[in-house]
From Swiss-Prot:
Keywords assigned: Chloroplast, Membrane, Mitochondrion, Plastid, Plastid inner membrane, Protein transport, Transmembrane, Transmembrane helix, Transport
Gene encoding the protein: HP30-2
UniProt name for this protein: Chloroplastic import inner membrane translocase subunit HP30-2
Phenotype upon gene inactivation: Plants lacking both HP30-1 and HP30-2 are yellow to pale-green and impaired import of CEQORH in chloroplast inner membranes.
Subunit structure: Probable component of a protein-conducting channel made of HP30-1, HP30-2 and HP20 that mediates the import of transit sequence-less proteins into the chloroplastic inner membrane. Interacts with CEQORH.
Presence of the UniProt keyword Transmembrane helix in the record: yes
Record organism: Arabidopsis thaliana
């Protein structure tokens, strides 16, 4: 009889969960799934050795840059080169990142974004933070890479240095402006486990309810239907949350030890 009752409860919970997922916006479902994959990938990548992480980040940045560059090259006309002074060709080639054909722009943007992402990754791993110095060094490196792929070895060294310095200055200015005008959202460490639970259940929109009721992570083993009702969480989500806590070995153990 006990097993039948437990089976009925499980089927009821699964039915409620299925209903909640059906009612969830498809775009929201995709965002949640993408966030889970992104978080898992970043967690895996952070555990790899520095050369592996740098190579993966550089490759991803290069692919992203190539896609953007190819798209821009498709939408913009290619600059004609007939009758141009050969001495000015190196400088002209460097200006074609924004006016060249799809392949030219894809190559140039791949070099810029790939090298920038790779150097920034290495700097962050070594220094343990993202700061102005890391941003400037990454931008300088991407400027050198851009000069090499756009003008080749025939380009004058001073042009490459000037271009790289320009990249570094612009990146430094944008970094400081970003620090001034943007306030990065810092996740509250007291709600980490609750946030993860709600994300798994597709109920992340109720995180504000948890914070409003001060239902921090230490209170999770003590949660009751009435406590969730007091913070205006509907019956369906309440069932899912309580069932999740009941199935979590660690939370269930704490709940039993307090009872």
């Amino acid at each position: 009889m006990g097993k039948d009752g437990e089976g009925d409860k499980k089927r009821e919970t699964m039915a409620v969960m299925s209903l909640m997922k059906d009612q969830q916006n498809p775009i929201q479902q995709f965002q949640v799934k993408f966030k889970e994959i992104e978080t898992g990938f970043k967690s895996w990548l952070s555990k790899q050795k520095l050369p592996v992480e740098a190579a993966v980040v550089t490759a991803m940045g290069g692919v992203q840059g190539a896609f953007i560059g190819g798209l821009m090259g498709t939408l913009s006309p290619e600059m004609p080169q007939a009758g141009i002074d050969p001495q000015a060709m190196a400088s002209l080639k460097q200006t074609q990142a924004l006016v060249g054909g799809p392949l030219v722009q894809a190559r140039n943007f791949a070099a810029i974004t790939g090298v920038n992402a790779g150097i920034a990754c290495v700097m962050k791993r070594i220094r343990g933070k993202e700061d102005l110095e890391s941003a400037v060094v990454a931008a300088f490196g991407s400027g050198v890479a851009y000069s090499l792929v756009s003008a080749g070895l025939q380009g004058q060294p001073m042009n490459a240095i000037t271009t790289a310095a320009g990249f570094a200055v612009f990146q430094g200015v944008f970094f400081k402006l970003g620090e001034r005008f943007s306030k990065p959202s810092v996740e509250d460490p007291y709600y980490t486990r609750g946030r993860s639970m709600l994300l798994k259940l597709g109920l992340e929109k109720y995180e504000k309810n948890f914070k409003k009721g001060l239902l921090a992570d230490p209170t999770l083993p003590l949660l009751t239907d009435s406590a969730l009702r007091d913070v205006s969480i509907p019956p369906g989500p309440r069932l899912l949350i309580l069932d999740h806590i009941q199935r979590d070995p660690e939370l269930k153990g704490k709940r039993g030890s307090r009872g």
